[in-house]
């Protein structure tokens, strides 16, 4: 019984340690130092979005919410390019950009070998682009 309880506590601790997160950040105005970041239109900002989370095989457990950045959610599959792109373009629109160009994305998945290999995965997705008027 104590062994099972210890394992449960260890797994809970690992889940909290690897709790999902999401964020959207931007650099605009003075952060661009007067540089033009696009060949057409007026530069508004460079916007970057990130989401990560813990998965059991392909089932999302604790992930960062793409709907509400900087919060976590349970069971929502938001660690993918589609969800993070929506997060980036939403922020671009909030910054009064009429379009988001030069989108670049990256995804990653890392196996967590404890307690059983190839069961738990840490997934990440990043998208960035330039907001212009």
Question: How would you name each of these model-derived features?
Answer:
Residues 39-110:
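Short, well-ordered alpha-helical segments
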Residues 23-26, 94-133:
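Surface-exposed short loop/turn segments
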Residues 1-21:
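Sec-dependent bacterial lipoprotein signal peptides
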Residues 15-37:
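Bacterial Sec signal peptide processing site at the extreme N-terminus
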Residues 31-35, 89, 114-117:
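Short secondary-structure capping micro-motifs at structural edges
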């Amino acid at each position: 019984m104590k062994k099972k309880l210890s394992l449960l506590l260890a797994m809970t601790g690992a889940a909290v340690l690897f709790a999902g997160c999401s964020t959207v950040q931007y650099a605009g105005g003075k952060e661009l130092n007067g540089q033009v970041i696009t060949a057409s239109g007026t530069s508004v900002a460079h916007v970057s979005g990130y989401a990560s989370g813990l998965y059991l095989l392909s089932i999302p457990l604790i992930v960062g919410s793409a709907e509400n950045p900087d919060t976590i959610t349970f069971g929502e599959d938001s660690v993918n390019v589609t969800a993070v792109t929506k997060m980036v373009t939403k922020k671009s629109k909030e910054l009064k950009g009429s379009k988001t160009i030069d989108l670049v994305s990256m995804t990653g998945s890392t196996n967590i070998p404890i307690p059983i290999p190839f069961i738990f995965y840490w997934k990440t997705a990043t998208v960035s682009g330039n907001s212009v008027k």
